């Protein structure tokens, strides 16, 4: 099993879950030195490569049964979405060339018929681009992933603890369906053992629909602030 995006929040937590489940894991990294200190580093095969460099993906995907695509740009550059599309197409083509059985991708939850942000629309377009080469893709779509260290959790923690009084921006009233990191990892690992998920888009989320403001209030109550 190949895992990309292992320096990120979710990819780095997916690797030990796969190892615990008994899978042989290979990880792709642009710079393997950035992985030093990870407690799983000696249990995996590390291959250096870049999703924007097609030729570097061929050895990374050689002999792989399934691949996790956990890459998306957090850049605000003018062409980040085009770079994301090119990276996904490179990965899909390299997976096809190596006869990879399936790609598993974690994208973003949102109605494509509404006015999505460029980043969210790009994540959904990435899922489509991955499948263009013909390799079956299991695409999970999640809103915000919550867990200690996640961007969303740390933002809520910081604003609640450091900014007790503020003029609320509009996004505070945005409704979202948060999901715990543990549940996301459960879905990602279970997909390997669920072949019927191939070719499907699966929306995942927690039981509650909340605003960011609701979550900040709940955090404050739990912390006794």
Where are these regions (language model features)?
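Rossmann-fold NAD(P)-dependent oxidoreductase module
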Residues: 13-17, 94, 129, 218, ...
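N-terminal Rossmann NAD(P)H-binding glycine-rich loop of SDR-like oxidoreductase domains
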Residues: 1-24, 29
């Amino acid at each position: 099993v190949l895992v990309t995006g292992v320096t990120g929040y979710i990819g780095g937590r997916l690797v030990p879950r796969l190892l615990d489940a008994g899978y042989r894991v290979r990880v792709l990294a642009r710079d393997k030195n950035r992985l030093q200190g990870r407690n799983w580093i000696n249990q995996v095969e590390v291959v250096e490569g870049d999703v924007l460099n097609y030729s570097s993906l061929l050895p990374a995907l050689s002999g792989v049964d399934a691949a996790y695509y956990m890459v998306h740009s957090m850049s605000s550059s003018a062409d980040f979405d085009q770079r994301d599309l090119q990276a996904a197409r490179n990965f899909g083509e390299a997976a096809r060339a190596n006869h990879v059985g399936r790609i598993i991708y974690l994208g973003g939850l949102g109605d494509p018929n509404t006015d999505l942000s460029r980043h969210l629309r790009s994540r959904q377009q990435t899922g489509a681009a991955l499948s263009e080469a013909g390799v079956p893709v299991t695409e999970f779509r999640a809103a915000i992933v919550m867990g200690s260290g996640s961007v969303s959790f740390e933002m809520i923690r910081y604003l609640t603890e450091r900014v007790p009084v503020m003029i609320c921006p509009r996004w505070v009233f945005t409704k979202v369906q948060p999901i715990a990191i543990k549940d996301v990892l459960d879905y990602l690992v279970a997909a390997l053992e669920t072949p019927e998920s191939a070719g499907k888009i699966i929306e995942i989320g927690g039981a509650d629909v909340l605003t960011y403001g609701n979550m900040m209030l709940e955090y404050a109550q739990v912390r006794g602030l």
